[in-house]
Amino acid sequence: MEVDKKFNNISIFNFNESWVNVEFDDPSSKNALSENMINELNNFLDQIERNDKIRGISFKGSNGMFCSGANLKEINEIFKASEPKDKAHKISTSIGKLLKRIQSLPQVTIMIVEGAAMAGGFGIMCAGDISIVHSKAKFSLTETMIGLTPAQISPYVIKKAGFANAKKLMITAE
C-alpha cells in the first residue's frame, strides 16, 4: 500500500475513498505519543472528521508495535523544565483531548493492535470503536509501575474492559 501522506510520526494511507488507515510511525520510540505525534494526529483529524465521504479510520502501529504510551524522553524533559507543572499539564491535557476526540469521531474507528499497547497507547486502543488484537499482543498500564495513575485513560479503559478488569489493570499494571 502506498503512503498518501507522511508526517514525521504518522503515515496516512487511503484504502479507498471511504476508508483511511493511520499508522503510528516512529519506530525509534516504539511509536510513543510525543507532543509532535499528538499534534500530527489532531491536524489529521481536523482534516477528516467532517468529511462525509470518509466512513471509517483504522489505526495501527508500525514495526509490530501499536503504541508505547507517552514519550518518556519528553516526560523526562518536563521534569527538567523551569515550569514542569505547566508543561506536564499541557501534555496531559493534549493526550486527554486526543482520546476524547477519537472516541467522538463520527467515523467508525478500528484499532489494529500488534505488539504492545502500553499506557496511553492502551488508552487509544480503548477509545476506538472496535479493536482487532493479535493473539500475541501485550497490554500494560506501565505508568502505575512508577507511581502514576492512568487518570487520562481510565474512563476509556473502564468503558472497554469493564470496571473489575480495569481496576485490576490499574492496580497491577498487567
Residue ranges and their predicted role:
Residues P27-K30, G64, G69, A116, ...:
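A short, glycine- and basic residue-enriched loop/turn
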Residues K30-N31, K73-N76, S140, K167:
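Nucleotide phosphate-binding site architecture
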Residues G61-K97:
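Glycine- (often His-adjacent) and acidic-residue-rich active-site loop
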Residues M1-S62, K100:
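Conserved CoA-thioester-binding segment of acyl-CoA-metabolizing enzymes
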Residues F59, N71, I124-C126:
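Hydrophobic/aromatic residues within transmembrane alpha-helices
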Residues S28, A32, N39, S82-T93, ...:
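Residues at secondary-structure transition points
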Residues K100-E174:
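Crotonase-fold acyl-CoA enzyme core
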